[in-house]
Amino acid sequence: VARAAAADGDLAGEVDWAGVGVLNAREAEPAEALRAGGAVSSEEGGSPELLLLLPFVSPVKLQAVRLEAPEAARAPKRVRLFANQRDLDMDDAAGGAAATQEWTELAWGPSAAGGGALAASLELNFLKFQNLGFLALYLAVEEEDGASVAVQGFRLSGRV
């Protein structure tokens, strides 16, 4: 059966949502919250980091990731992406393993969602995200900022 991404390149339909994991999340059902565009944040009093583990139904070609955050204080400052690395833990994702691509500063701007929400687009090195069956996203703010990290949605763009 031939598969195709949405006309606008949205790969949400290619994510195997039943297999999605979110490490260090405060919410009881973080995968469902992400799928519905709800906020997912790190545990209070813990380290301000999240690790999203996203399996795909079939291999995709990822071109861009768009993140949304509820407010500037909790928006990720550091993002590390890992292609096809299913065995990551938080220590690996934070720096113990080499990332496929990494950002240490994001350009956040107003989100279409409004209400103080922000959005940032990450353009990927397309050649590094071909034949992608699994994506891990590590999101963090600096520990000294004292805030938890939070995202309230993301969009994966590419091709099947």
Task: Describe each region flagged by the PLM.
Residues A93-L127:
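Extended, solvent-exposed segments with strong compositional bias
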Residues G38-A94, F126-V160:
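Aromatic, loop-rich ligand-recognition surfaces of beta-strand-rich domains
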